[in-house]
């Protein structure tokens, strides 16, 4: 967070994983669902390392923000303007779904969430861009799979969109994995599969249940829930 704070970022929006952290801190989750236990344990890990002032900052972020760059009007949202979760904007969905990103005051809509780079048009001709993902790329076509971090560069000159570049950058995936191990990241087995196989088994409840039992995460989470209760 300190690194992000030092960058000249002009627009920030709140994503679904941000809300998961806030919901964990607000006592929304319990000990019955393995996915909720996972979110609680990851939030606990985060809070052991994060200045609490960033939580207030996180709560203040909007779902949608707009910015004008040299006359071109951009909207930015994690997913839909009023919903930062769900599958409405999967890249092969109908154009009518993507029209929800657009209005008469938007020339270009930028969104994230689906972990895939995309350029397409709304039904009235505005452009829609997804820059992709830094650390969790999803590929349906096996030959296109790769680990590289994704981003996009949009160039505007004198009110005109002159260039869009979708980029992928390699980094040392094993070094990143070793760093996560050194820092004691919970559910490290799942992170290892993500880094090495480009597969994140986050919806595999059987795997989650086995890892929770293996590492006794329930006891960790019980202590965390009690701490949250005491501080509320």
What is each PLM-predicted segment?
Residues 26, 31-33, 59, 161, ...:
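Short leucine-rich amphipathic alpha-helices used at interfaces
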Residues 23-28, 88, 141-142, 177-179:
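Short aromatic-enriched loop/helix-cap "lid" or pocket-rim segments at secondary-structure transitions
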Residues 1-49:
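Core catalytic region of metal-dependent phosphoesterases/phosphodiesterases
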